[in-house]
């Protein structure tokens, strides 16, 4: 499909979904069937297109099994910042750059979260799974908290919404 003005992309795979050796600049929403999962492998850079949107929303389980070494354009034979897709404001036409291998921003998973290898998430993981195995940590992954996600959370992730009453806009009906 085409591009979305807000950088939001919804995927409904028929099975599990594997993401590897890629840069995703947007909000990826993955809706999985029962017993399926998203696996993030190898080296990736996933970051939101809009700072006020989450990075990943996964309805199902997620396994972050990637390496925090740099994502290399040379090794992947791919240009990850072509014209129209800048990284830190820069584009080019040659596959010679490298980028941090990490997920940046808010990650929301409704099922079980597993973090392995040297996976790095720079942000917040909202794990909505239940039970003792809702979050599994193996090897030496990193979760680097980003305080701004608490003080200025992405849309729809607020703690509360205050709705002040405006004078003259309500009344109590008589019994």
What are these regions (language model features)?
Residues 1-175:
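Long, polar low-complexity repeats
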């Amino acid at each position: 499909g085409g591009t979305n003005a807000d950088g939001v992309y919804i995927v409904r795979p028929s099975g599990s979904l594997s993401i590897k050796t890629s840069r995703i600049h947007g909000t990826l929403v993955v809706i999985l069937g029962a017993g399926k999962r998203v696996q993030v492998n190898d080296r990736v850079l996933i970051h939101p297109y809009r700072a006020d949107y989450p990075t990943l929303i996964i309805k199902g389980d997620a396994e972050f099994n990637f390496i925090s070494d740099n994502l290399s354009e040379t090794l992947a034979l791919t240009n990850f910042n072509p014209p129209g897709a800048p990284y830190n404001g820069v584009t080019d036409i040659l596959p010679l750059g490298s980028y941090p291998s990490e997920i940046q921003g808010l990650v929301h998973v409704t099922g079980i979260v597993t973090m392995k290898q040297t996976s790095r998430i720079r942000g917040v993981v909202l794990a909505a799974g239940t039970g003792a195995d809702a979050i599994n940590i193996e090897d030496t992954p990193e979760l680097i908290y980003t305080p701004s996600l608490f003080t200025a959370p992405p849309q729809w992730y607020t703690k509360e919404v205050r709705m002040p009453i405006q004078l003259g806009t309500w009344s109590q009906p008589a019994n």
